[in-house]
Amino acid sequence: MIKRSLASLVRVSSVMGRRYMIAAAGGERARFCPAVTNKKNHTVNTFQKRFVESSTDGQVVPQEVLNLPLEKYHEEADDYLDHLLDSLEELSEAHPDCIPDVELSHGVMTLEIPAFGTYVINKQPPNKQIWLASPLSGPNRFDLLNGEWVSLRNGTKLTDILTEEVEKAISKSQ
């Protein structure tokens, strides 16, 4: 059943002695691209679509997110992480038992909160996103939308999640 469904999405064609894959999905036009055989003699598609037009819950991704230039992504993400680091370091100085360690290196921030665990906030340049791994709220991905890092899954803002969870940790330690 699954194999049949996949076969209906992608089929291999032989045109003038060369192998090509016809790739089509979700209403987009079919594209011809060279097919390659891997070591297990399976045909694989060499075409990869970089962006999708809908989120994981089926909502349409705003054009602002899809058309974000990579340079602007890096500038905005680096600025956000630098400002976040400054804010968290101030909180760490005021509440050293609650937030003993905050580090930022090469686009990856780690935040240690003994009451909850370790947070990882990192850049994902291929997706132009910032990812959060939180011991409380779990993993989430954020896109730059209207100047804020927002989850397209549920509309939450990265700043709001971090503020809420850090405030919980501080109130728990007092």
Curated annotation (Swiss-Prot):
It is found in: Mitochondrion matrix. Changing residue 93 to A: Impairs oligomerization and iron mineralization. Residues 1-21 form a transit peptide. It comes from the Eukaryota. Processed in two steps by mitochondrial processing peptidase (MPP). MPP first cleaves the precursor to intermediate form and subsequently converts the intermediate to mature size protein. Monomer. Forms a 24-mer complex made up of 8 copies of a trimeric subcomplex. Increments in mitochondrial iron uptake induce stepwise assembly of species ranging from trimers to 24-mers. Interacts with ISU1 with a 1 to 1 stoichiometry; the interaction is direct. Interacts with YHB1, SDH1, SDH2, AIM45 and CIR1. Present with 1560 molecules/cell in log phase SD medium. This is Frataxin homolog, mitochondrial. It comes from Saccharomyces cerevisiae (strain ATCC 204508 / S288c).
